[in-house]
Design a protein with these regions (language model features):
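Hydrophobic alpha-helical segments in the ANL/AMP-binding
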Residues: 1-16, 25-26, 144-145, 166-173
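Conserved S/T- and glycine-rich ATP-binding loop of Class I adenylate-forming
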Residues: 6, 37, 114, 120-123, ...
């Protein structure tokens, strides 16, 4: 979905661990220079509002001037913040885009372009963003295919978060 589409237009994906505090989320969003935030569920929130991503971004959203939209994925509680938009409305924003524009962006991607930023846990200060290129991901996919056998139609379970390299690899590539 949004992960692949972001990379297909030449933009860079950065993920945030579901355990990050509001301050850590703010730091990563600013450091990555993100323009759009896609906000989903925290599978480990146990119904506690303070653990829900929605409640971690709200306290710092006012300090994130460069954010254009916070896109709320399906079944995420809507807020009255002007930057928050639900998934269906966000998709409708692109309804006038010509498909040839999308293909042109896709064709302009260079294998050495940054595809994603993976942030470290920040055990010695603020998290550091590690750049991974499209070539990095291609290499990882090809090596993984040599070791792991995935057949079309099979199902698997991945418990790794998208903020983890292997989580991104098996869930999105």
């Amino acid at each position: 979905g949004s992960y692949a589409a972001t990379q297909m237009i030449g933009s860079i994906v950065a993920s945030v661990y579901h355990t990050c505090s509001s301050d850590e989320v703010e730091w990563i969003v600013k450091n990555s220079n993100a323009k759009i935030i896609f906000l989903g569920n925290n599978p480990n929130d146990n119904g506690e509002k303070k653990k829900m991503p929605h409640y971690r971004i709200l306290p710092v959203l006012g300090q994130l001037d460069h954010i254009q939209h916070v896109v709320l994925m399906k079944n995420i509680e809507q807020s009255n913040h002007e930057k928050m938009v639900d998934w269906d409305d966000f998709i409708n924003y692109g309804s006038d885009i010509n498909e040839s524009e999308i293909h042109a962006k896709l064709n302009n991607i260079n294998v050495n372009d940054t595809a994603s930023l993976i942030y470290t846990s920040g055990t010695t200060g603020n998290p550091k963003g590690v750049e991974l290129t499209h070539a990095n991901w291609s290499f990882e996919v090809s090596r993984s295919q040599e070791i792991l056998e995935f057949n079309q139609g099979e199902k698997y379970v991945s418990w790794l978060p998208l903020a983890h390299v292997f989580g991104q690899l098996v869930d999105n590539h």
